[in-house]
C-alpha cells in the first residue's frame, strides 16, 4: 500500500469553528490535507490507503468504525505513516476515557491516565523547550512564548523524548492594596512555579514518527499562544472547506505547529 504524501486531519468540529486554526496553518505552509470533521466517521475507503500523517485532535473514538484504528496503527508501525495527537475533551483519556485501552494508545509516546485528564489553569502554563536542536522547536523565540490555559495530563513512555515542558504558575499581587495604579512596581507582582509537566512528547521507536501535544491548537486551551509572534498572519482557508473562511494568528504560533506537522509526517 502506497503512503500518500498528505495529511488526514480528524476532529475539532469543522472549519467554521475550532478546525479553522490548524486548517489555516496547513494552508499557509502549503501542506496538502484532507478533513474529517468532528462527529463524523472517516470515508468508506479509509482503510484502502495510507496518509503520511494522521492528526487526531478532539476526535471521539466512537467516530471510528471497526478496523479504522487498527489501520492507523498498522500504517504507523509497518508503513511509516506518522501520528500526531493534540489535546482536547475527546483526546487522550479526555472527559470519558476516549483512547484508553484503544489500539491508538498502544503507539502513542505517552501513558494515559485512567481518569479525567483535562486540566484548566487560570494562570498561564509556560512552555520551555528541553533542547533547541530538534526541528520541531528550533528557530523559535521561546523566551517570549505566551502561556497556555488548558491541557490533557499524561506521562512519557520509557524511551520517548520530552521536547517541551509545561510549568504551571500562579501570578498574584504581593499586596494588592499597596500596589496602587500610580506606584505599581515589578516587585509588587509575584510569580510562583507550581508544577512541571511533560507537554510535547515524541518517539521514533516505530517505523513512523509519533507525537503527543498536551494542549489544543485552538482557543481557549491554547491561550495567548495563538497570537504568538509578529507580524500577524491573515490566512484564507481553501474554498472546499467553506466560503470566505479565514484565520488571523501569530506567525510564531503558526511556525511551531507547521514544524510539528512536518516533522511528525516526515515531510
Which sequence ranges carry the predicted segments?
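A short, well-structured beta->alpha microelement
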Residues: 27-47
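Short alpha-beta junction capping motif
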Residues: 6-12, 50-96, 204-207, 211-213
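Alpha-helical scaffolding within the catalytic cores
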Residues: 38-43, 70, 195-199
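Short, charged N-terminal beta->alpha structural module
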Residues: 6-30
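Short, solvent-exposed loop/turn elements at domain surfaces
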Residues: 16-19, 93, 171-174, 212, ...
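An acidic, glycine-rich "communication" segment
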Residues: 85-182, 192
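Soluble non-cytosolic domains of exported or imported proteins
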Residues: 13-17, 62-66, 70, 247-255
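Extracellular ligand-binding/catalytic regions of CAZymes and related secreted enzymes
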Residues: 1-7, 76, 182-267
Amino acid at each position: 500500500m502506497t503512503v500518500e504524501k498528505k495529511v488526514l486531519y480528524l476532529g475539532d468540529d469543522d472549519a467554521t469553528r475550532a478546525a479553522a486554526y490548524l486548517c489555516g496553518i496547513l494552508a499557509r505552509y502549503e501542506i496538502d490535507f484532507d478533513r474529517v470533521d468532528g462527529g463524523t466517521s472517516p470515508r468508506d475507503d479509509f482503510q484502502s490507503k495510507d496518509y503520511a500523517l494522521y492528526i487526531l485532535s478532539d476526535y471521539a473514538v466512537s467516530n471510528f468504525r471497526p478496523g479504522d484504528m487498527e489501520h492507523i496503527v498498522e500504517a504507523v508501525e509497518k508503513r511509516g505513516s506518522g501520528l500526531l495527537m493534540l489535546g482536547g475533551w475527546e483526546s487522550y483519556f479526555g472527559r470519558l476515557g476516549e483512547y484508553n485501552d484503544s489500539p491508538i494508545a498502544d503507539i502513542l509516546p505517552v501513558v494515559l491516565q485512567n481518569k479525567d485528564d483535562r486540566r484548566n489553569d487560570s494562570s498561564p502554563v509556560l512552555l520551555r523547550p528541553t533542547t533547541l536542536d530538534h526541528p520541531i522547536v528550533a528557530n523559535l523565540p521561546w523566551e517570549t512564548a505566551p502561556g497556555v490555559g488548558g491541557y490533557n495530563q499524561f506521562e512519557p513512555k520509557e524511551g520517548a523524548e520530552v521536547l517541551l515542558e509545561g510549568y504551571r504558575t500562579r501570578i498574584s499581587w504581593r499586596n494588592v492594596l499597596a500596589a496602587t495604579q500610580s506606584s505599581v512596581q515589578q516587585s509588587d507582582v509575584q510569580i510562583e512555579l507550581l508544577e512541571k509537566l511533560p507537554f510535547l512528547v515524541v518517539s521514533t521507536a516505530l517505523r513512523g514518527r509519533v507525537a503527543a501535544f498536551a494542549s489544543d491548537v485552538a482557543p481557549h486551551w491554547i491561550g495567548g499562544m495563538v497570537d504568538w509572534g509578529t507580524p500577524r498572519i491573515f490566512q484564507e482557508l481553501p474554498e472546499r472547506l467553506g466560503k470566505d473562511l479565514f484565520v488571523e494568528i501569530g506567525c510564531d504560533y503558526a511556525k511551531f505547529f507547521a514544524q510539528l506537522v512536518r516533522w511528525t509526517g516526515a515531510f
